[in-house]
Design a protein with these regions (language model features):
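N-terminal beta1-alpha1-beta2 submodule of the flavodoxin-like/Rossmannoid cofactor-binding fold
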Residues: 1-94, 101-110, 114, 195-199
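Short histidine/acidic/glycine/proline-rich micro-motifs that form metal-
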Residues: 11-13, 143-144, 180-182
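Hydrophobic/aromatic beta-strand patches that form the interior of the parallel beta-sheet core
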Residues: 5, 39-41, 136-138, 173-175
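Glycine-rich phosphate/pyrophosphate-binding loop and the adjoining helix
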Residues: 27, 147-199
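Short, glycine-/small-residue-rich phosphate/pyrophosphate-handling segment
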Residues: 121-166
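Cofactor-binding loop segments of dinucleotide-utilizing enzymes, especially the Rossmann-like FAD-
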Residues: 9, 140, 177
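Short, well-ordered alpha-helix to beta-strand connector turns
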Residues: 87-88, 132-133, 169
Length: 199
């Protein structure tokens, strides 16, 4: 049995192409692992706060100085990290907004990248602590960024590969549905993305 964590970051709800692509990945995973369970974390419906001073202080406070206030400030972070630790597979929906990821997804990432929780430093080098998990990214975009003249404009995939790899999530597969704003491509963009899914 596999535990799947589905992380939604699109603000478009039922009209979201990243969610549709994400669901195709999940459907394929459930067909492969019939007894799998899916936990859905919708970062738009259940917002993670952008980091403030209270969060940063709570993340780095020494154990002897911890307090109920600091523990409260860590609530979202602890929840997000626990969900990742319990999952075998992560399926993350990534609509590209302004060449990068949605702020809702960035806020979630800021809560999961934690010293002594998801990464540590050994001999001066960072080491990820979240290991042995598979990650699928369901990327949707109006432009075509996987190849061609605008490939360098995509800051979403390189960033996600780097930051997730930083905490140990290095087994990453990307599926794309792209070109929704490109004449001649937009009508087949979603279907082409769905047909590319293989897990």
């Amino acid at each position: 049995m596999k535990k799947i964590l589905s992380v939604i970051s699109s603000a478009r709800g039922k009209a979201s192409n990243s969610i549709r692509l994400q669901q195709e990945i999940i459907d394929k995973l459930q067909a492969r692992y019939p007894e799998s369970t899916v936990t859905v974390r919708d970062l738009v419906a259940q917002k993670y706060p952008h980091l403030e001073e209270s969060h940063l202080t709570a993340f780095y406070v020494q154990e002897e100085n911890d307090s109920p206030e600091y523990r409260l400030a860590r609530t979202h972070s602890e929840q997000a990290i626990r969900e990742i630790e319990e999952a075998d597979i992560l399926v993350i929906g990534v609509p590209i907004y302004n060449f990068s990821i949605p702020s809702a997804l960035k806020a979630w990432i800021d809560h999961i990248v934690r010293s002594r929780k998801t990464f540590t430093v050994v001999d001066g080098r960072p080491e990820g602590l979240v290991k042995n998990k598979k990650v699928y990214l369901a990327v949707a975009s109006g432009g075509v960024f996987s190849d061609g003249p605008y490939k360098s404009w995509d800051f979403a995939e390189p960033y996600l590969r780097h930051i997730l790899g930083f905490i140990g999530l290095t087994d990453i597969t990307v599926f794309r549905a792209e070109g929704f704003s490109v004449p001649g491509v937009q009508d087949v963009a979603l279907q082409k993305g769905i047909e590319s899914v293989a897990v």
